């Protein structure tokens, strides 16, 4: 172990699990400081310039404050692409990539798609890149999120149309006929806050995370209602869901006159995706 990795591990060992510290050490050295991975593996001692030393100290300081490494780097990997992220948007999760993969697999001929609550734009842009003949629209209520999404759209050479839209307002919502509506809306209840890590609670946007305990399905219910207006006959809904509400979601979606409702487990064996046909 060289002095740099030893310094990183010593600085973070009381905050992060050993395996995460090891992964962070490699990420910081190779990706953020430009150190050759082979030199790390061989234990070669590395001398950083004064500028790189200050950069390292800043990274460590921010990690000690529980800031997610993705925000420190300024981007996160999702579906094989790097997306800009900042505290105004959620950090993309692997479970959400499963949602994108499922949509692409099941709907290769889809032509019109809508992503509601787009955040960084990771779902919408990934669908646009993987379904090149499709036209993708994306909504969010947050101007901060939309600014980041539009930047990702430009940098990744995608053609998504982004718009500020409050789903609980009828203003601006017209009867466009979509093949697919997808959403990963807020679904963490206030009670579940106690189970969350500090790097999520302290840094990621509450607007994109939490729903009231007394109405955890409020966003899904409203989007299902919109789907009756905006989906063509035979169009599909795709949701990322809270694992605790799979059966409640099925009942609510069926009450909204959708058919072929399915709940699909994620890579961790938890109910995570719901699909339904109009």
From Swiss-Prot:
Q: Which GO terms describe its molecular function?
A: nucleic acid binding; protein-(glutamine-N5) methyltransferase activity; protein-glutamine N-methyltransferase activity
Give the enzyme's main class according to its UniProt record, as a single word.
transferase
User: Which reactions fall under this protein's catalytic activity?
Assistant: L-glutaminyl-[peptide chain release factor] + S-adenosyl-L-methionine = N(5)-methyl-L-glutaminyl-[peptide chain release factor] + S-adenosyl-L-homocysteine + H(+)
- Can you tell me which residues bind S-adenosyl-L-methionine? 117-121, 140, 184
Lineage top rank: taxon: Bacteria
One biological process term in Gene Ontology: methylation
Stored SUPFAM superfamilies: S-adenosyl-L-methionine-dependent methyltransferases (SSF53335)
- Signal sequence segment: none
Q: What is the E.C. number?
A: 2.1.1.297
Q: Which parts pass through the membrane?
A: none
Q: Where does substrate bind?
A: 184-187
For this UniProt record, give its keywords in alphabetical order, as a comma-separated list: Methyltransferase, S-adenosyl-L-methionine, Transferase
Which PANTHER family does the record associate with it?
A: HEMK METHYLTRANSFERASE, MTRF1L RELEASE FACTOR GLUTAMINE METHYLTRANSFERASE
NCBIfam families xrefs: hemK_fam (TIGR00536), RF_mod_PrmC (TIGR03534)
The protein's role, per its UniProt record? Methylates the class 1 translation termination release factors RF1/PrfA and RF2/PrfB on the glutamine residue of the universally conserved GGQ motif.
Q: Tell me its family.
A: Belongs to the protein N5-glutamine methyltransferase family. PrmC subfamily.
Q: Which HAMAP family match?
A: RF_methyltr_PrmC
Protein name as catalogued:
Release factor glutamine methyltransferase
The species this protein was found in: Bacteroides thetaiotaomicron (strain ATCC 29148 / DSM 2079 / JCM 5827 / CCUG 10774 / NCTC 10582 / VPI-5482 / E50)
Name of the encoding gene: prmC
